[in-house]
Amino acid sequence: MDSAFANLDAAGFLQIWQHFDADDNGYIEGKELDDFFRHMLKKLQPKDKITDERVQQIKKSFMSAYDATFDGRLQIEELANMILPQEENFLLIFRREAPLDNSVEFMKIWRKYDADSSGYISAAELKNFLKDLFLQHKKKIPPNKLDEYTDAMMKIFDKNKDGRLDLNDLARILALQENFLLQFKMDASSQVERKRDFEKIFAHYDVSRTGALEGPEVDGFVKDMMELVRPSISGGDLDKFRECLLTHCDMNKDGKIQKSELALCLGLKHKP
């Protein structure tokens, strides 16, 4: 393996690949190959001078090893197999086949399978979890491929070998989008800016467009809020903070957080 790729992880590799494989057909072709390898080298060695000779050297090495059909193009799986460690490679392939939209969608699925709020999902539950996830994205996965994904996940992420995965494990596996709340800096904003940001935030989590956060919408908001101050949270932590949020914000005790209630909790005056 070339030293240029020693520190590359799946997230970084995927971001670069998607930039060049614009039509998402699983190939990088022609001049794109030169641009692709040049970009990767610049990303990984920002202080080094990237010469045409170095680019062609890397390109030749990859093409001779993986372009078995001599058609002048490479597949993402071939590159991943060569330059990524096993764990990151698996994450890469999985992310391409089943991207999740946001934390609300993730929590809808989590709540369906963690029905007892234990904070864990067993191997059997995981298999059903994946099946529904692929159906949600209108993808038909053969039984053998479903078994392969399930087994691989348990082997990689079930570190203590107790046959179950926690909330944080699945959040990483399913590659949730970057925390939506990271783009906002409420403390440093004026009242006008805070109100504007609040509208964006509420609209993002109010997926059902009912004017209130309920069920997985509350879960998704709580998850992102907690992760602003605590990068790794458990299912139990989420449930405790969710209960706390409802206690303080759900003024009419209907199990939902109305837009006006959340605004009040955040120190904003909301006009219906």
UniProtKB/Swiss-Prot annotation:
Chief localization: cytoplasm
Note the Pfam families from the entry: EF-hand_5, EF-hand_7
Query: Does this entry carry the keyword ATP-binding?
Result: no
**Any one biological process term the GO annotation gives:** spinal cord motor neuron differentiation
Transferase listed as a keyword: no
Q: Which residues bind Ca(2+) 1?
A: D21, D23, N25, Y27, E32
Residues spanning the membrane = none
Q: Which residues bind Ca(2+) 5?
A: D250, N252, D254, K256, E261
Q: Which residues bind Ca(2+) 2?
A: D114, D116, S118, Y120, E125
- GO CC aspect terms: cytosol; dendrite; nucleus; synapse; terminal bouton
Q: Where in the cell is it found?
A: Cytoplasm
InterPro entries linked to this entry: Calbindin_Ca-bind, EF-hand-dom_pair, EF_Hand_1_Ca_BS, EF_hand_dom, EFh_SCGN
Keywords, in A-Z order: Calcium, Cytoplasm, Metal-binding, Repeat
The protein depicted here goes by the name Secretagogin
Q: Please name the source species.
A: Danio rerio (Zebrafish)
